């Protein structure tokens, strides 16, 4: 109910749709149940004009050099780490470059197929992560942004 009211008021809701952690080399399947929960909340609260914004966060450099697969586990938030422990580890140690990429916004209605929506978002996130990890250009639109 709280999520629906928040969306109906025009506010953002942040969902980490993977629901689990990885070292940043792969994108795990996005949980379509989270899209379903958002749709249910939308219907209950009468929220309209809801948009899903696919986002990718990639640690691309360590001490100015590209991050290797082995080094990703030193940066990633993996399983049993607390938020506090993870933030402390990221902020300590070597300098890290982080890239945040925004994909194509996806309008969401209560009638959309949650599995199709989550798969489309997952494909965008995966394509952006692969491009960032390889040092390539982001796929898609001209307005695709990096921070």
Regions found by a protein language model. Give the residues of each.
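Membrane-interfacial amphipathic helices and adjacent loop/beta segments
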Residues: 1-8
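Long, highly charged amphipathic alpha-helices
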Residues: 2, 33, 37, 116, ...
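Structured helix-beta-strand junction loops
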Residues: 9-10, 94
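Generic beta-sheet signal
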Residues: 11-17
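A cross-family acyltransferase "interaction/gating" segment
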Residues: 23-112, 138-139
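Membrane-proximal, solvent-exposed terminal domains/tails of membrane-associated proteins
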Residues: 103-107, 112, 116-118, 126-138, ...
């Amino acid at each position: 109910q709280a999520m629906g009211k928040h969306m109906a008021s025009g506010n953002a809701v942040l969902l980490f749709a993977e629901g689990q952690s990885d070292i940043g080399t792969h994108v795990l399947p996005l949980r379509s149940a989270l899209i379903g929960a958002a749709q249910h909340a939308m219907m209950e609260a009468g929220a309209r004009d809801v948009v899903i914004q696919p986002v990718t966060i990639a640690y691309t450099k360590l001490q100015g050099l590209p991050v290797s697969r082995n080094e990703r586990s030193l940066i990633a938030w993996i399983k049993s780490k607390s938020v506090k422990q993870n933030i402390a580890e990221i902020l300590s140690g070597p300098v890290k470059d982080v890239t945040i990429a925004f994909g194509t916004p996806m309008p969401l209605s209560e009638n959309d197929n949650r599995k199709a929506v989550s798969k489309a978002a997952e494909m965008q996130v995966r394509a952006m992560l692969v491009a960032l990890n390889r040092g390539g250009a982001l796929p898609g639109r001209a307005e695709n942004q990096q921070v």
